[in-house]
Amino acid sequence: MAKTATPGACASDPGSGPLPENYEMALAELEALVARMEGGTLSLEDSLAAYRRGAALVAFCQQQLEKAEQQVRVLDGASLKPLSAGTAAADGEDDDL
């Protein structure tokens, strides 16, 4: 029986693997990955693997943020209102205290 690979994962890709346990761990890994990529020392193959991993991490982070937003909506009774410029300015006045 033939083995099937996990979509988006490649056995020869060291950057592929299970997603982190939570948003904070994913964000930390993504920041480290970006720093490595910005360093300019990765080979083309490693850069592509890093890009794929980064894309997976970004998707995971977006999913986690959407889940958190949904939970806030439930807790807040779906009464969230868009933040207006006037509200943001009024809230920012206390920053100098």
UniProtKB/Swiss-Prot annotation:
Belongs to the XseB family. Pfam families: Exonuc_VII_S. SUPFAM superfamilies: XseB-like. Bidirectionally degrades single-stranded DNA into large acid-insoluble oligonucleotides, which are then degraded further into small acid-soluble oligonucleotides. It catalyses: Exonucleolytic cleavage in either 5'- to 3'- or 3'- to 5'-direction to yield nucleoside 5'-phosphates. NCBIfam families: PRK00977.1-5, xseB. Transmembrane segments: none annotated. One of its GO terms (biological process) is DNA catabolic process. Its EC number is 3.1.11.6. PANTHER family: EXODEOXYRIBONUCLEASE 7 SMALL SUBUNIT. It comes from the Bacteria. One of its GO terms (molecular function) is exodeoxyribonuclease VII activity. This is Exodeoxyribonuclease 7 small subunit. Keywords: Cytoplasm, Exonuclease, Hydrolase, Nuclease. Its main location: cytoplasm. One of its GO terms (cellular component) is exodeoxyribonuclease VII complex. Heterooligomer composed of large and small subunits. InterPro entries: Exonuc_VII_S, Exonuc_VII_ssu_sf. It is found in: Cytoplasm. Residues 1-21 are annotated as: Disordered.
